[in-house]
Amino acid sequence: MSVEEFRQVIDIDLNAPFIMSKAVIPGMIKKGHGKIINICSMMSELGRETVSAYAAAKGGLKMLTRNICSEFGEHNIQCNGIGPGYIATPQTAPLRELQADGSRHPFDRFIISKTPAARWGTPDDLMGPAVFLASDASDFVNGHILYVDGGILAYIGKQP
């Protein structure tokens, strides 16, 4: 990965949420409340080959989320994050396609075998947590990252 590619990932996955937060927080302070939901990632908890920039950006976003909570919580602003696990999207489709011999892609087998839910997540799996974090029911939830990962972090965390 080049330095420019690294910077681009940081710009999209860390700097953009920071800039968005700076833009909306003054209005939230004036209004007396607000909710920010950042899309973090389970990769903020893991070190994995080939995802250094992404993991660094999402780790930074996790800490930005917690710091916005600390800095602006007194203004009744909640800042939380959703940490998706492996989600079935068009971007991950090549990893879920059957091989020419009819077998599953090795990464697909890995995800299914290591995720206690035994499946990839779907975008729909993220809707309920987002609705909860945006609702009044989460008014006392602040600075939290809600991992929606089918349990893979718990499973990987217990491995030797």
Predicted regions and their residues:
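Substrate-binding pocket helix/loop in short-chain dehydrogenase/reductase
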Residues: 2-10, 107, 111
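Active-site helix of classical SDR
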Residues: 21, 57, 65
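Alpha-helical segment proximal to the catalytic Tyr-Lys
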Residues: 26, 70-74, 139
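Residue(s) in the substrate-gating loop at a strand-loop-helix junction
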Residues: 41
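Short C-terminal tail/terminal secondary-structure segment
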Residues: 46, 130-131, 142-160
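Active-site loop immediately N-terminal to the catalytic Tyr-X3-Lys motif
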Residues: 46-52, 74-75, 118, 136
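C-terminal helical subdomain
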Residues: 81, 104-137, 141, 150
